[in-house]
């Protein structure tokens, strides 16, 4: 597929600088783009690459337009504009409607004639798969699940039981949704399993990364509201609620019954203690641990920043003496009084 700069600008409301008839057939980074490819500049640290880039078209802000050698598309937010343009060249294989002969479908399950059910799929009792859905190879849909219209389960996705997916949900390989929550009670020195009788509800336009686990609730449902984006290898425990338009980066863990607001961003390897609340529009930076509820929007961090090993070892040794040093300072203060 080849598109002109003018056609792209018209589709996404961008301004063309230079030759609008310039054609592009793909996308690439500034450093590696060649003839016929489109790139973008959004982060100032990559501005030096603009002068040497061989990209046919570059999406950038108006402030950077003078540095562009060839055709440019001016956007208020170049990264968002690039994402929309790149989607034009992301041609996924077409999955034709139909059920593969190796699929096993319970007689009480309902599968839309417009859905694609791939090889070795299993669909359990009373579950429903909507129109335009794609159920990838080896995926398992347990009993009493709903996969609404236009949703896609890539290979080896597991919906254990009582999982309801909204429209246009995309789940990547290896994800497990609706497994038992980690509910235990101690009785006479032995653990007793607490039955997990709830389910999982995932709203429209959510995306769940590979090998992520979202446990079903003990009594009430675990809920992800609409347009939540979850990266790979994330654990969301039972009875959590994630607000709409929030995003959670890889290797994060959210303990049971935590409530996260709308438009929140959690960096990689963030830990959230259970039974707390995070308000809307909170950013938690990578490797932070949230131990208390957050009631004010903003950016929050915890942990030790990276430094050279020698400095870190000295600081670690001093940290062990922190209580002693604090007592000495208090004692000096009292003496001066």
Curated annotation (Swiss-Prot):
Known catalytic reactions: a UDP-3-O-[(3R)-3-hydroxyacyl]-alpha-D-glucosamine + a (3R)-hydroxyacyl-[ACP] = a UDP-2-N,3-O-bis[(3R)-3-hydroxyacyl]-alpha-D-glucosamine + holo-[ACP] + H(+)
EC class: transferase
InterPro entries reported in the protein's UniProt record: Hexapep, LpxD, Trimer_LpxA-like_sf, UDP_GlcNAc_AcTrfase_non-rep
UniProt GO cellular component terms: membrane
GO biological process, any: lipid A biosynthetic process
Alphabetical keyword list: Acyltransferase, Lipid A biosynthesis, Lipid biosynthesis, Lipid metabolism, Repeat, Transferase
Source taxon at top rank: Bacteria
Pathway in which the depicted protein is active: Bacterial outer membrane biogenesis; LPS lipid A biosynthesis
Location of the active site: 238 (proton acceptor)
EC annotation from Swiss-Prot or TrEMBL: 2.3.1.191
GO molecular function: N-acyltransferase activity
Claim: Zinc is one of the keywords in the record: no
Subunit annotation: Homotrimer.
Known role: Catalyzes the N-acylation of UDP-3-O-acylglucosamine using 3-hydroxyacyl-ACP as the acyl donor. Is involved in the biosynthesis of lipid A, a phosphorylated glycolipid that anchors the lipopolysaccharide to the outer membrane of the cell.
Family: Belongs to the transferase hexapeptide repeat family. LpxD subfamily.
Protein name, entry field: UDP-3-O-acylglucosamine N-acyltransferase
